[in-house]
A protein has these predicted regions:
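Cytosol/matrix-facing juxtamembrane amphipathic
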Residues: 2-53, 105-170
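Small-residue-rich hydrophobic membrane-insertion segments
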Residues: 53-128
Length: 170
């Protein structure tokens, strides 16, 4: 039975996250099931600028090409200012979960808005903390939204791409 699942990866660099996204797309995986979360800049003193035109977001700065490239492939691009994180950029289905959490003023046991949204998709508090730390350290979190079959396919593809750093979440 194909039950809903979420698989997650943490990438050290934006290049690694971009390569993984491209590899999944070339392998026939539906990239609309991918969410990427990370900072849009390298320091709080030098933020990246963003503006929207239609459904596209344009960006500048050291990671601007990365986000611009992903926003051409993934859907629901967005940028948020989040206390404790600064500017956080994301794309994919998770964006709507975060917007819902922000609109509903969801507070979950002292977690940030990002943490509350992550917990809403079934991620444990310990994993939420791990992802928040990764994002604050300029790493990138990839979430794959799908069913068991999707997650198994992605895991096989990305295991070939790099060491196994994935973890299934229920």
């Amino acid at each position: 039975m194909n039950t809903p699942k979420l698989i997650s990866y943490i990438f050290e660099t934006h290049q690694e996250a971009e390569e993984a996204t491209k590899l999944l797309g070339k392998s026939g995986f539906d990239v609309k099931k991918i969410s990427i979360i990370g900072k849009g800049y390298h320091s709080e003193e030098h933020p990246v600028g963003f503006y929207t035109t239609s459904d596209k977001i344009k960006s500048w700065g050291s990671t601007g090409a990365f986000w611009g490239g992903l926003w051409g492939v993934l859907f629901l691009p967005a940028v948020f200012f989040m206390p404790g994180f600064g500017l956080v950029a994301m794309a994919g289905p998770f964006t709507s979960v975060l917007v819902s959490a922000l609109e509903g003023a969801v507070v979950v046991g002292g977690l940030s808005a990002l943490g509350a949204a992550l917990s809403q998709v079934g991620i444990s508090k310990n994993e939420v903390i791990k992802y928040e730390v990764a994002i604050k350290a300029d790493q990138f979190v990839m979430l794959i939204h799908g069913v068991t079959e999707d997650c198994e396919k992605v895991d096989l593809i990305l295991k070939k791409f790099r060491d196994n750093k994935s973890q299934y979440l229920v």
